[in-house]
C-alpha cells in the first residue's frame, strides 16, 4: 500500500471495484462499504470522485490527531460527489476526533446529512440538501470548524404532530414539532463561518411554520460569523433543557434575509430566551454587526423574551422587520448602536436610530449606500 509521511491516500469512484486496493484513482474502490471497513489511521485520506453518487451511509469511527487528521475529500472535476440514502437516517457520520471533510455533498439522508459526534471535527466546502438537518453537531461535539458550506432546502420536519387540548392544562404535543434545520448545534466552542443557508422552512402543526438556519440547543460559546442566511423561517433560535445550557453564543457579521412570501411570513432573525421560558435562560448571547431584512407580515428581526437575560448584548446591527425590529422584555441588557427599522417595544438607546438604513437596493443589495 503506497503511503507517505502524512498517511495513505484511498480513492472511491463509481467505476471502481471493491476488489481493488483503493490506493489510486486507477484502482479505486466502488462502494462506501470499503471505506466503512477500512482501519483509517491519522493522516489517511479518502477521496471520492466528483460527479459520482454513492448510496448508503459513510461512517468513520477512528480518530486522527491534531497534526494528522483523517480527511474525506474529492478528486476530479465536476459536481461534488454525493452521498445519499443514509444509514439510520444519516449519510455521513463522524464518530472520531480530528476528522476533516472537504468537498462532499449529503442529500436526501432521512434525518441528517452530516452528523458529527467527535471533537475537533471540520466540514468545509461541502453541501447538504433535502434533510431534516443539513449538518448536526451532536452533544459533546466540541471545538469544530464549519466553513464555506452550502445548506439548501433542508426542510423536512423530524417531528410534526398535531397537538390536542392546546392552550389548556391538559395540552399534549402542542410544542414538540422540530426539524428543517440547516445546522443543528448541540455542541460547544465550535466556529461557523462563510456558510450559505437557504430554504430551512416547513409547515408545522404547532407553530404554523418551523425551521432554522442555525439551531442551538444545549450548546455553549459557539461563534457564528460571516454567514449568509436567505429565506429561512428563523436565522437562529437558542434553547436549553434537561439540565443543559445554551450560554455565551455569539453572532457577528451575518447577513439574514427572508423574502419568500408565505414560507417567510413568520420569519425571524434571532430568538433568545429568559428564565421564565421552559427552554431558557440563554445567557450571555451577543448579537452584533449583523444585517437582518425581513418582509413577512409577522416577521421579527430580534426577540429576547421570557425575562430576557441581563447578559444579552444587541449591538451595531441593522434590524428591519414588519412586526418587530427588536423586542426585549425585562431590563439590564445592552442595546446600543443599532438601526431599528420597524416597531420596537423598547426605548432605543441614545446611540441607536430609527432612521431608514439607506440600502443600495433592498432587498436585492443590502450594502449601505452612504
Whereabouts are the PLM-identified features?
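Feature marks extracellular polysaccharide-active and adherence modules
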Residues: 49, 61, 73-75, 94-95, ...
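Right-handed parallel beta-helix/beta-solenoid
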Residues: 1-33, 50-52, 75-76, 356-362
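Extracellular beta-strand/beta-solenoid scaffold signature
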Residues: 59, 84-92, 108-115, 130-141, ...
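Loop/turn elements at helix/coil->beta-strand transitions in domains of secreted/extracellular proteins
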Residues: 6-9, 41-45, 68, 79, ...
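Solenoid scaffold repeats with emphasis on beta-solenoid/beta-helix
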Residues: 58, 70, 81, 90-92, ...
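Predominantly extracellular beta-rich ligand-binding scaffolds that present long acidic/polar faces
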Residues: 56, 61, 223-229, 248-369
Amino acid at each position: 500500500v503506497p503511503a507517505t509521511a502524512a498517511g495513505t491516500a484511498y480513492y472511491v469512484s463509481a467505476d471502481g471495484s471493491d476488489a481493488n486496493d483503493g490506493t489510486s484513482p486507477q484502482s479505486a474502490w466502488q462502494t462506501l462499504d470499503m471505506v466503512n471497513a477500512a482501519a483509517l489511521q491519522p493522516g489517511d485520506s479518502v477521496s471520492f470522485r466528483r460527479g459520482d453518487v454513492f448510496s448508503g451511509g459513510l461512517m468513520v469511527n477512528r480518530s486522527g490527531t491534531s497534526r494528522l487528521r483523517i480527511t474525506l475529500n474529492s478528486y476530479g472535476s465536476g459536481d461534488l460527489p454525493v452521498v445519499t440514502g443514509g444509514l439510520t437516517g444519516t449519510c455521513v457520520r463522524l464518530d472520531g476526533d480530528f476528522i476533516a471533510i472537504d468537498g462532499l455533498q449529503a442529500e436526501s439522508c432521512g434525518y441528517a446529512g452530516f452528523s458529527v459526534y467527535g471533537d475537533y471535527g471540520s466540514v468545509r466546502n461541502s453541501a447538504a440538501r433535502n434533510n431534516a438537518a443539513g449538518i448536526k453537531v451532536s452533544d459533546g461535539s466540541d471545538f469544530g470548524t464549519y466553513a464555506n458550506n452550502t445548506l439548501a432546502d433542508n426542510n423536512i420536519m423530524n417531528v410534526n404532530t398535531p397537538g390536542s387540548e392546546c392552550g389548556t392544562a391538559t395540552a399534549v404535543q402542542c410544542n414538540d414539532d422540530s426539524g428543517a434545520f440547516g445546522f443543528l448545534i448541540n455542541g460547544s466552542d465550535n466556529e461557523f463561518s462563510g456558510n450559505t443557508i437557504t430554504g430551512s422552512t416547513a409547515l408545522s402543526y404547532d407553530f404554523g411554520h418551523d425551521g432554522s438556519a442555525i439551531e442551538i440547543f444545549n450548546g455553549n460559546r459557539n461563534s457564528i460569523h460571516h454567514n449568509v442566511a436567505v429565506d429561512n423561517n428563523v436565522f437562529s433560535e437558542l434553547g436549553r433543557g434537561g439540565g443543559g445550557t445554551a450560554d455565551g453564543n455569539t453572532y457577528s457579521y451575518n447577513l439574514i434575509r427572508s423574502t419568500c412570501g408565505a414560507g417567510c411570513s413568520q420569519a425571524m432573525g434571532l430568538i433568545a430566551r429568559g428564565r421564565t421560558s421552559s427552554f431558557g435562560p440563554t445567557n450571555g448571547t451577543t448579537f452584533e454587526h449583523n444585517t437582518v431584512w425581513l418582509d413577512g407580515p409577522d416577521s421579527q428581526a430580534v426577540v429576547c423574551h421570557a425575562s430576557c437575560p441581563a447578559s444579552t448584548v444587541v449591538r451595531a446591527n441593522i434590524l428591519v422587520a414588519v412586526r418587530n425590529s427588536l423586542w426585549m422584555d425585562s431590563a439590564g441588557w445592552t442595546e446600543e448602536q443599532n438601526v431599528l427599522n420597524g416597531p420596537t417595544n423598547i426605548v432605543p438607546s441614545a446611540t441607536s436610530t430609527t432612521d431608514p438604513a439607506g440600502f443600495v437596493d433592498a432587498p436585492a443589495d443590502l450594502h449601505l449606500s452612504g
